[in-house]
Amino acid sequence: MSIINTAVQPFKTEAFHNGKFVTVTDETLKGHWSVLIFMPAAFTFNCPTEIEDAAENYAEFQKLGAEVYIVTTDTHFSHKVWHETSPAVGKAKFPLVGDPTHTLTNAFGVHIPEAGLALRGTFIINPEGVIKTAEIHSNEIARDVSETLRKCMIINEKIRPII
């Protein structure tokens, strides 16, 4: 069953953002476009490259009214250390969301139960909290965040009133 055009299920978790721990909920995702980028775990091979890519494109996401959220099955404490020790991850100005209970990874269909990790998944959610795009692939395949930005631009164009 597809999750496209379904509402994000209720959740509450913690994130590391702008040097502090913050709570992130399904309500946090409302009122603006949200891009959830799921990664297997902190300190894994491709993740810093993808986070750096997202950081380099972050201003463009913000121009579209979108917030980026990186999600792994680690805790927000792990994300703090990751942010402080990895030059690439340290560029992130967006929340690094912990999902140690696998609430989000299960809700979005990216949980790998036998490993306790997430598949690489990217989801664009509208300001009402409805999932508009979903892309999931094997953890061996790194993503190009500029492609996600392109999708956000297309969605943004389609919803803007024509003047």
Mark where each language-model region is.
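Chalcogenol-based redox active-site neighborhoods
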Residues: 1-163
